[in-house]
Amino acid sequence: MLGEQVGLGVRVESVDLQDSTISDRVEREGGATGEVQISLAWEDRNDLDLHVFAPSGERVYFNQRRSGCGGELDVDMNARPTSSTPVENVVWKENAPSGTYRVGVHFYRHHRRRGTKRQTTFTLRTTALGEVAEFTGSLVFGDAMLMVTSFTLP
């Protein structure tokens, strides 16, 4: 991905394309794949939220699931603490617009009654026109949104 930037406190991981954990979760929840796909996975019942800022300036997230430029949040998990292997997924199935995409993660809700910790580690995978990148980071409940990465499509 051209012009990729990485946020503070975020590690870039080598991508094992044989490891289909994130893809399996997206498929399990009925999520789509496409020209641009950003998926977030974590390992507890807390509610993390994926935020993707499109080149148009629109934000795709739980409160605006579709953008006018074709982006869609098609999987949003753990508003209620239903899964210990959650995933979220934002996708542009086709005709992804040119420009810069910025990706953030927010620790929205700590589900204390489910025995979850106040810190959650996550993995974020971006796929853009066939190029895959993976990032890991962690958030503490109460932190501001962590801007994980940005990338530019020509």
Predicted regions and their residues:
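Intrinsic-disorder/low-complexity signal
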Residues: 2, 6-154
